[in-house]
Curated annotation (Swiss-Prot):
Localization: Cytoplasm
Pfam families: Aminotran_5
Gene assigned in the entry: serC
GO cellular component assignments: cytoplasm
Catalyzed reaction equations: O-phospho-L-serine + 2-oxoglutarate = 3-phosphooxypyruvate + L-glutamate; 4-(phosphooxy)-L-threonine + 2-oxoglutarate = (R)-3-hydroxy-2-oxo-4-phosphooxybutanoate + L-glutamate
Protein name: Phosphoserine aminotransferase
Cited SUPFAM superfamilies: PLP-dependent transferases
E.C. numbers: 2.6.1.52
Residues involved in L-glutamate binding: R42
Keyword annotations from UniProtKB, A to Z: Amino-acid biosynthesis, Aminotransferase, Cytoplasm, Pyridoxal phosphate, Pyridoxine biosynthesis, Serine biosynthesis, Transferase
Subunit organization: Homodimer.
Keyword Transferase annotated: yes
Amino acid sequence: MSAIYNFCAGPAMLPAAVMKKAQQELLDWNGLGVSVMEVSHRGKEFIALTKQAEADLRELMHIPQNYHVLFMHGGGRGQFSAVVNNFLGNQGRALYLVSGQWSSAALAEAQKLAGDAQIDSLNIVEKQNGLNAVVLPDLHKIDADYRYVHYCPNETVDGIEIFDELDSPWPIVADLSSTIMSREIDVSRYGLIYAGAQKNIGPSGLSIVIVRDDMLKLPSLTQSSIMDYRLAVEHDSMFNTPPTFAWYLAAEVFAWLKSLGGVASIAKINQQKAQMLYACIDANPFYKNGVVAANRSQMNVTFQLADESLDGAFLKEAEAASLVALKGHRIVGGMRASLYNAMPLEGVAALVSFMNEFAAKHS
């Protein structure tokens, strides 16, 4: 069977080596004679797995000791709610920077749940010569007392990425669902980081939360216990039964990434992949991208065909060439190629070759 390259934005492809290992030990994990899906989450074998997973993630991201690492339910949308409930209190105030669909969704959830708390927002994307560009505000010039400022460094729908680390006088809360471990960041700059697993970590259903000690002292709203960061810390992410199989696969992905040389190594590969695909788009008037070069996402490359009537043919022929899940999000249309850590260079090279051939055939 020839390789199929899956460009889905999430759930995304997992590393082949991880999938093969999971297949091999699916029915007999750690010599126990049962699947990892069947063992107790409080058994010594699974506890050892969780401790190794946290240690590996801390090593990969250089997470300081004054941060807690949580493995939680609910994905990114669950964290939209959890952030508000854990940090705002009844009289708090927060700022949301809006750069695309996902930061807009986080803002909408905050406004829904805030009650007497105040939610402010700033749109940080503007048009420059017809292209979307991020313009970060000088937050130090804003006269306000915010509990936190929230932003999303990578917008999967819009194909926008913010590479400059935010400079803020208030704690930064960041949705890294689609960019976590794709490039190096300074974790110590953040009050809280959260990420749904289904792009660069593992299967859907799991979310990672990295929270600084002092954030847990902020007043909280009345909230559900299952999304209470303080309870999650107290119970080592096991206040209730966690998504154990997703946790297991995340642990295997961390080990795989370490074997490649860590985040610094995969970041170089990710940069190569994105440059290869954007070069193809820029070199051919048959394709167009709507984002300024400085904010083009490395993880989610969005593009349109000059002749939209060929969209269906493009997707059909791409699938026949074993290049799947290239349809853009329903909100923006066009095409989207997601190049998460598990996507090999060979997959992007195959896509570029196909795009050149398709353009030549239909020009």
